[in-house]
Amino acid sequence: MTQEELDKIIKKHQHFLKQDCKGWEKMKADLSEEQLEHLVFQNADLAYAVFNRARLYRCTIENCNISHASMVEADLGFSTIKNTKFVDTDFTKASLSDAEFNEVRFSGANLSYARFEWSHAPFCDFTNAKLYEARLNSTYLKSSTFNLADMSFCHLANCCLRECEFVKANLSYAFIHGADLTFAKFDKTDLTEVKHDHGTHGFALACPEKGAFTAFKKIFSKPKRNIWSKDVEPLIVELRVPAKALRSSATSRKCRVSEAKVVSITSLDGERKFDVGYSAHNIHFEYRKGQTVVPNKFDKNRWKQCAPGIHCFITRDEAVQYTDF
C-alpha cells in the first residue's frame, strides 16, 4: 500500500467515526493483512480500525488515536511510536519487538501472548492492560505504569523496570530473571510464585531475612532543621540490629528496621569519634553511643520504602554516599 492510499483510507474513516454522511457504516478502516511497511501515521484518528495480521514494519506512528482497535497478530516490529493512544486495543499475539515507544498509552489494551522484546518503551501507560504470558524480555520500560494490569506468567527477563508502578497488579508466576526493579512500586500487588534470580535487582530483601546484622546510617552532629548549615556535620552511625528486629528493604538498597543498638558514631572519613548524633528527619530523634534506638512505630509493609522505621544501609559506603534527605 502507498502513503497516498493509506491517507485516503484514514480520511474515509473519519466519516465512520462522525457518522456524518450516507454510507458511513462501510467507511471503517480495515487494514487487515495489508503491507504497510515504512508508512507514516501522523495526527490520525483510527479508533475502532482493524489491523489484524497487518504488517506495519518500521512504520512511524505519532500523535495518533488508535484506541478500541483490533491489531491481532499485527507486526509493528522496528516501528517508532510516540504520543499515541492504544486504549482498549487488542494486540493478542501481535509483535511489537525492537520498536521505539515514547509516552504511549496501552491502558486497558489486550497484549496477551504478544511479543514486546528488545523494545524501548519508557513512560508508557499499561494501566489495567492484559499482558498474560506476554514476552517483554530485555525491554526498557523505565517509569512506566502497570497499575491493575494482569501480568500473570509474563516474561520480563532482563527488563529495565526501574521506577515502574505495579499497584494492585497481578504478577503471579511472572519471570523476572535479571530484571531491574530498583525503586519500583509494589502495593497490594499479587507476587505469587514470581520467578527471580541473583541477577534480579530490587526484588529480594537487601538485608538478612533473619538473625542479627550490622547496618550503617548517615546522621548529623546537631539537631538543626537545616542540615546543610556549615556548622552541621554529617556523621555515620554504626548500628547493630538484633535478631528480633523487624526488617524491610522495598525495592532499593535502603533498609528499614524496628530497632537497633548504636555501636559507634564517626565522621565520614572514620577518623573522628562522637558520642551523639541526630536524625535528619526528626530533630528530636537522638542516636547516642551504647543506647538502643526504637522508632515511634514501624510499618510492616515489605514494599513500602518511605515509611516509619530506622532507615539504614548494609554497607558503610552506601550510607556515606546517601544524599536523599
Q: Which residues make up each language-model segment?
A:
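Tandem repeat scaffolds
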Residues: 3-8, 18-231, 247
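Short, glycine-biased loop/turn motifs at secondary-structure junctions and
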Residues: 177-178, 182-325
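Short, exposed beta-strand "edge-strand" segments with a Pro/Gly-rich flavor and a Y/T-containing core
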Residues: 1, 24-27, 307-314
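Hydrophobic alpha-helical segments and their boundary regions
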Residues: 2, 8-9, 279, 304
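A short linear-motif detector with a strong N-terminal bias
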Residues: 7-10, 290-291
